[in-house]
Amino acid sequence: SAYFDDDNVLQLEFKLWDVVTQKALTEGGGSADPAGLRRIAHKVADFIYVEFTGDKKYFDTKIVYISESGPQDKRKKRLAIMDQDGHNHRFLTSGRDLVLTPRFSPTAHEIAYLNYFNDEPNICLFEIATGRTEKLGSFPGMTFAPRFHPDGNKLIMSLAEDGSTNIFEMDLLTRNTKQLTRTVHIDTAPSYSCLL
């Protein structure tokens, strides 16, 4: 059932009913203001999806990406975010600097990405709730695709120096960087496994 209370807040209660056994499989509820109707619908859809598939939630998720626009000779690349179904798109950066390779933290509260300012690659951390960007480090040469450790406390990336590209790990609590590979080869695109 769903109804708007005296404060114009939607109150929702639902049951997932098995028509064969004539029993409720699960039930839940919640509330939302009129602007949050899509979000509560996504949360209910997630509840049902998880119950039937056993998979992780999907409908109440976001996508972070690079949006490129403008004339060919003055392209702007902006960090952007939207709901998984394409709604609620918004830009997170102005397009003044080149931005690349955004990645959500495991909590989805932060985004790590590359920012090229004055042709120098910087690894940045964007806090979604506040809109605050923090520069984590500047690295000479090329820097590639920072990715989060499953616990959210480290980043892994590739850094190119003196003709070699090696894998480095940054501790986000101390900002210390540790080199993990030391080869003359090109070691790039590192990623942590989910199961540690």
What is each residue range found by the language model?
Residues S1-A41:
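Amphipathic beta-strand/beta-sheet edge segments enriched in Tyr/Trp
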Residues L12, T61, K77-L79, P121-I123, ...:
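Repetitive beta-architecture junctions, highlighting loop-to-beta-strand starts
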Residues L37-P71, K76:
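Pro/Ala/Gly-rich low-complexity, hydrophilic intrinsically disordered segments
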Residues K56, E68-R78, S94-D97, L114-I123, ...:
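A flexible loop/linker signature enriched in serine peptidases of the S9 family
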Residues K57-F59, P106-T107, P150-D151, C194-L195:
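Residue-level detector of Asp-centered blade-edge/turn motifs that repeat once per structural unit
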Residues I63, I111-A112, G152-I156, L196:
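Hydrophobic beta-strand positions that form the internal "hydrophobic ladder"
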Residues D83-L100, F126-F144, M170-T188:
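Multi-bladed beta-propeller domains
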